[in-house]
């Protein structure tokens, strides 16, 4: 079934539209951008079961990080939703095809944390080669290192970087940034990316290989920088690990599902992979006490934080809010800057031809209560509240708001839709 949803009504004659931050509670960055066109709610939820009914019924826009997942079943709970903006680049936690079917645009912020993710990737690579983490840990544990023999023992496995071959899987924004940094350290850099047109390897001075097998066979260190989809889940598995060079390193700052952690743990224990560094994991939040990696040696793990800096966080939140603003003040999807399901949305929906009064009877004389301007708290443990600005405590709204009627979804027009691309080069990490 295709969803038929109208444009977002905005202006003095219409109710102030509701926008919700689904899995967070800090709206201080978003408010200056949205306060004159929307009421901003924060839900602080980890699933749609924790999202207040008012948001499910009335929110036209949603902001979200990577800590909540929206399946088709989840998306169908939102009765008025027109746009979701992922505060970050990756959107594998959203069913974008189902969103398109339901008339919901999905956008991301692909560029804000490119530098941070690339820097973190190089940090992991350098850590594996120079064993900084393990040397620090040895001193913390009281190991006394004085003689040359003791240094050799505690630093065993440290290697020279110059002349080593770094293999990059996925040469999107982050992949390119990693390549440029790696060359400065003396790496020979090759990459595998079947979606890029010819010529970029010449522009960047890189070596391109035509198959994943070639990259794995020729790389001393493999680093992942591609989005996650149904085609590349467990791209690194027991079979592909065996195609890697004996004693190679593995780094993943992209998506946890790209690596089969059971296969990786076994390869680390057997020494087929000399060391690995992961910022993303199959199950998050990650814990060393659970899962197949708990006993794996020569492993560095960080908590999906490679993307973060204060500057990057502010930039991506500002851009996400601006995308929501474009949706409210403009036309979906034409006014959007980073809509990742635009083709599917355009083919599957015909909201532009609908009379808004038909789809939203409250705009045609039905009773409707307007939110006061500011931030609305609809956190799981709280009641709806609104304030003029942002303060720790919120003033309660009445629970007696009249219900808003929403029609059933219109039947599918039966058009042939263009399939989504298997991969978007803007989805490198976050």
Swiss-Prot record:
One of its GO terms (cellular component) is extrinsic component of presynaptic endocytic zone membrane. The level of phosphorylation appears to be regulated during the cell cycle. Phosphorylation by HIPK2 on Ser-412 induces proteasomal degradation. Changing residue 55 to R: Strongly reduces interaction with E1A. Cofactor binding induces a conformational change. The modification Phosphoserine is found at residues 289, 412. It is an enzyme of class 1 (oxidoreductase). There is a cross-link at residue 418 (Glycyl lysine isopeptide (Lys-Gly) (interchain with G-Cter in SUMO)). The active site is at residues 255, 284, 304. It holds the Pfam family 2-Hacid_dh. Its main location: cytoplasm. Belongs to the D-isomer specific 2-hydroxyacid dehydrogenase family. The record marks 364-365, 377-378, 399-400 as: Cleavage. Keywords: ADP-ribosylation, Cytoplasm, Differentiation, Isopeptide bond, NAD, Nucleus, Oxidoreductase, Phosphoprotein, Repressor, Synapse, Synaptosome, Transcription, Transcription regulation, Ubl conjugation. Residues 1-59 are annotated as: Interaction with GLIS2 1. Residues 398-430 are annotated as: Disordered. Coiled coil: none annotated. InterPro entries: CtBP, CTBP_dehydrogenase, D-isomer_2_OHA_DH_cat_dom, D-isomer_DH_CS, D-isomer_DH_CS1, D-isomer_DH_NAD-bd, NAD(P)-bd_dom_sf. GO terms for molecular function: acyltransferase activity; chromatin binding; DNA-binding transcription factor binding; identical protein binding; lncRNA binding; NAD binding; oxidoreductase activity, acting on the CH-OH group of donors, NAD or NADP as acceptor; PDZ domain binding. Homo- or heterodimer. Heterodimer with CTBP2. Interacts with ELK3 (via its PXDLS motif). Interacts with RBBP8 (via its PXDLS motif); the interaction is disrupted by binding to adenovirus E1A. Interacts with PNN, MECOM and ZFHX1B. Interacts with ZNF366 (via PXDLS motif). Interaction with SATB1 (non-acetylated form); the interaction stabilizes its attachment to DNA and promotes transcription repression. Interacts with PRDM16; the interaction represses white adipose tissue (WAT)-specific genes expression. Interacts with GLIS2, HIPK2, FOXP1, FOXP2, HDAC4, HDAC5, HDAC9, NRIP1 and WIZ. This is C-terminal-binding protein 1. GO terms for biological process: membrane fusion; negative regulation of DNA-templated transcription; negative regulation of transcription by RNA polymerase II; Notch signaling pathway; presynapse to nucleus signaling pathway; regulation of cell cycle; regulation of transcription by RNA polymerase II; synaptic vesicle clustering. Residues 419-430 have a biased composition (Basic and acidic residues). Residues 277-349 are annotated as: Interaction with GLIS2 2. Disulfide bonds: none annotated. It is found in: Cytoplasm; Nucleus; Synapse, Synaptosome. Corepressor targeting diverse transcription regulators such as GLIS2 or BCL6. Has dehydrogenase activity. Involved in controlling the equilibrium between tubular and stacked structures in the Golgi complex. Functions in brown adipose tissue (BAT) differentiation.
């Amino acid at each position: 079934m295709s969803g038929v949803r109208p444009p977002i009504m905005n202006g003095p004659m219409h109710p102030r539209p509701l926008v919700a931050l689904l899995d967070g509670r800090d709206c201080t960055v978003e408010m200056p951008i949205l306060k004159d066109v929307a009421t901003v709610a924060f839900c602080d939820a980890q699933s749609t079961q924790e999202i207040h009914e008012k948001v499910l019924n009335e929110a036209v826009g949603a902001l979200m990080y990577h800590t909540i997942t929206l399946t088709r079943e989840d998306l169908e709970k939102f009765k008025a939703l027109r746009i979701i903006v992922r505060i970050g680049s990756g959107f594998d936690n959203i069913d974008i095809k189902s969103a398109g079917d339901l008339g919901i645009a999905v956008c991301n912020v692909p560029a804000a944390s490119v530098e941070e993710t690339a820097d973190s990737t190089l940090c992991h690579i350098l850590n594996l080669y120079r064993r900084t983490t393990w040397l620090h840990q040895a001193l913390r544990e009281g190991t006394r290192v004085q003689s040359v023999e003791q240094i050799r023992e505690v630093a065993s496995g440290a290697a020279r970087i110059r002349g080593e071959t770094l293999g990059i899987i996925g040469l999107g924004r982050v992949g390119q940034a990693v390549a440029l940094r790696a060359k400065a350290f003396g790496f020979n850099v090759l990459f595998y990316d079947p979606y890029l047109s010819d010529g970029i390897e010449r522009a960047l001075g890189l070596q391109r290989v035509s198959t994943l097998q070639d990259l794995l066979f020729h790389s001393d260190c493999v680093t992942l920088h591609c989005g996650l989809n149904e085609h590349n889940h467990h791209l690194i598995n027991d079979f592909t690990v065996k195609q890697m060079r004996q004693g190679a390193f593995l780094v993943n700052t992209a998506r946890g599902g790209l690596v089969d952690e059971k296969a990786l743990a076994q390869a680390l224990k057997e020494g087929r992979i000399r060391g690995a560094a992961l910022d993303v994991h199959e199950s998050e939040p990650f814990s060393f006490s659970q899962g197949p990696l708990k006993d794996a040696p020569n492993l560095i793990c960080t908590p999906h934080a490679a993307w973060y800096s204060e500057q990057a966080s502010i930039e991506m939140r500002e851009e996400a809010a601006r995308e929501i603003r474009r949706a409210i003040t403009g036309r979906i999807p034409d006014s959007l800057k980073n809509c990742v399901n635009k083709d599917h949305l355009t083919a599957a929906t015909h909201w532009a031809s609908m009379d808004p009064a038909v789809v939203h009877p409250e705009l045609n004389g039905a009773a409707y209560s307007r939110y006061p301007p500011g931030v609305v708290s609809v956190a799981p443990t709280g009641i709806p509240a609104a304030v003029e600005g942002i303060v720790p405590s919120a003033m309660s709204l009445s629970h007696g708001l009249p219900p808003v009627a929403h029609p059933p979804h219109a039947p599918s027009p039966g058009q042939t839709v263009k399939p989504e691309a298997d991969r978007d080069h803007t989805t490198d990490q976050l």
